[in-house]
Amino acid sequence: MKSYFCVTPSGWQETQTRPRIVPKHSEKCSRTYSRPRSSLSDSEGRCVVLPRDGGGRKRKSNGSQGRCSNNPGRPSRKWTEKTIAASRQGFFSKRDNGYWVPKSPEKKYVPKVFPRNMDNKKSFKDVLTSPAKIQIKPTPESILLAQKIQNSTFKSRGKVTLSQFSLPLINRFQEIQLTTHLEPVEESTPFGVNDQRAQHLFCKKVPRKIGRNTVLVCPITGTESHIDAKRGISARIVDSMASVVHTENLPAYERGHVVTKNVSRTKRVCTPVPIIGTFSDRAIRVECDDHTDELASASSVPSIWKPSKKQHAVPISSSNEMGSAVGTKPDWYTPVKTCTHRQYQKVQRVFLDAMNIMRTLRFHTGPQELRETWVKCWLQVHKKNVAFPGWMITPLLSGTVPCEQEFFLPKAGETRGFATVCYA
């Protein structure tokens, strides 16, 4: 019992003792009835349950205003700090037609014996006196950075300088980019929130009719896709970095800018070719087994290209659903398993890793070596026989074979491979 003084208007001090409020749940207290508004404070100490619509909260004549509103785990009275006597398994609250308040047991605080050293773990003093070991998460950028710092890994042509004007420029539009807005070209720029280079990743293009032909349009940005839904893509590789320019943009590329077609076809925007092109988001589906987790991870790229465990190449159409061998159909005719989203994400991550690495490497190696590495990477992914979305296959083909490429994408609901036509 807590006793406290209160000064009454007459000035004399009176010691009051507040009775402890313990909800008594007895059989007498049925949860359904409501008393008349006058007798809210229950003289017998029985719990009074008011219906929710009973107009306002019950106020005690006592000093205690009831427990603070939402404290279900450890309900305590507001000023007396006394924990409500609740049984071990919980209790029915007095408010809101008596919902069940579960009781969470409190953990005892047992202080650990400080000087004792369990399992030769370091003490604070050891940690503070020993030098720090810095651990870096092996993202491709951090690996490259570490290797660049160690200066042992890359055979760079001459000296690696970070100054922007001594960079060997490969793409003829990087010069424009450097002179107009000085972007740091050497490091691979991380993707921003609404990055244009990533449009093809986060924007699912939707077929819209413009005039009499159907075009795929990104509903976010309103950009038309370069694919015609019927004909497929046609693209050409334009420089030693295997930059891809789609054929209808080629005259614009020759003039030194790229035309972005808008849905209204009124505005023409002139921009230099971005370092990463945008590719189709329609998946070019190759048969997909569950080997995706064996793909090159960031830690093993680009230093060592491990061959796959199975050394022999697996023909895609070795057997049909019945399990008997099929030799008659052309090999792109195989029925296609579509990848799950997780597999797709894995492949996409590997691809982006490889792409960033190649972009960072391009200043340290010659174009020949660069292309060989690129092809090695892709051969490794090919060996795993995974599903390639179009935006991945386009740079692969255009980067490997330096000539015009045609990709025919399967129409909706059609399981068909893709054909590569190369005029050498």
From Swiss-Prot:
InterPro entries xrefs: SatRNA_48 (IPR035312)
Name of one Pfam family that matches: SatRNA_48
Compositional bias ranges of the Polar residues kind: 31-42, 62-73
Ranges where the record places region Disordered: 15-78
Domain of life: Viruses
Family in the record: Belongs to the nepovirus satellite RNA 48 kDa protein family.
Name of the molecule in the record: Satellite RNA 48 kDa protein
